[in-house]
Amino acid sequence: MEGECAAYDWNDFARCLEVIDPLKQGYARASEVVNYLESHDEQRAMRDVLDSGFDEQRARPKSALGAALLFTMPGEPMLYHGQEWGEATPRLTNERNTLHWEETGDDGGKWLLNRYKQLAWLRRRHGALRGQGFSLDASYPDQTSLIYHRWDGTGDELVVAVNFSPAPQTLRVPFPSQGRWSEVFDGETLDVDIQGDYVADIAPSSARVYVKS
């Protein structure tokens, strides 16, 4: 998902819909794919966002959106040291690239680090995020938004609603099964009827992750 499908540069929406599922790219198993937002070979995502004219207050939510995809998409997530708090040191070739560890204590760095911790815990707890079960259940090109479903066949299910747009969006979220669903980040709970739809308000450049209770 790095490069043209990075959360901060979601310009080719149709192309990104094609590559979001590794099984449709010819891979036999999701575990054969390594997803990443940053690596030592490219400029850091936060640096690119800041250089595009965003301030840190708007840049970190974009990084958090990328993290939500990274930990909930099929494939294995890879982190580049520092991205979990929004390190923005410019890439220097053949020189030491400084890490600003003190930023983990700043409000913005602490918030982003906690979001990464939440997502890492979520992936560790839910086998559905580490397995093969994946379906793209809705896409809204005009709103630059999509919704996908993860499952593992044991009853563990998650629904991820993603808004890549810089504006808030109201989306119809199709839940695949009835029961109680809880949103990971704000604790909202929903009682869903059989294949019930729910209308969700999603903030700009953000994701909502629902877990079946």
Model region roles, listed by residue range:
Residues 83, 102-107, 190, 208-210:
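Carbohydrate-binding surfaces of carbohydrate-active enzymes
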Residues 174-188:
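Solvent-exposed beta-hairpin/edge-strand motifs
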Residues 92-102:
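Acyl/amide activation-and-transfer machinery of modular secondary-metabolite enzymes
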Residues 31, 61-64, 68, 110-117, ...:
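A structural signal for well-ordered alpha-helical segments within the folded catalytic domains
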Residues 1-94, 124, 134, 140-171, ...:
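Conserved alpha/beta catalytic core and glycan-binding cleft of carbohydrate-active enzymes
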Residues 193-213:
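C-terminal beta-strand-rich structural cap/linker in extracellular carbohydrate-active enzymes
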Residues 16, 21, 100-139, 206:
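Aromatic- and carboxylate-lined catalytic core of secreted/periplasmic carbohydrate-active enzymes
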